[in-house]
Amino acid sequence: LTSGGSEIKARLVEFIEDAGLADSNIEEASVLVAGGRGVGSADGFDKLRELARLLGGNIAASRGAVEEGWISKDYQVGATGKTVTPKIYFACGISGAVPHVVGMKDSEIIIAVNTDPAAPIFDIAHYGIVGDLHKVIPELIEIIKETGK
């Protein structure tokens, strides 16, 4: 797996059978794949939905993505949204502003993907990937599909 010319070493630890996407009850999800303004558009959430589906989780969003009109407020995490505590929280294109972080900081594992190495989300992430989510997420999806068969 490579991103931006750098190699990313990945290993599938566990494959969770495709459980489909749940409704907007993100508080109950064990895996959340969240997108922020860095997703770039409503269509940008398509790959996040696919990753969430493969992991048996759900999607979520930052206030910025909701304000852009890319996703319903039902999926918003943070001070003006919902508080979540999943086992795994993917923060994709989310800067890590305090109002968002207060709603997800107690997640067991936080994985951040952002092009800005100084993004505050990396301060709380257990794992971080500095790279373009539009390259990293599709590569991760392919790894899961290849190793999950």
Protein language model regions, located:
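N-terminal glycine-rich FAD/FM-binding segment characteristic of electron-transfer flavoproteins
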Residues: 1-149
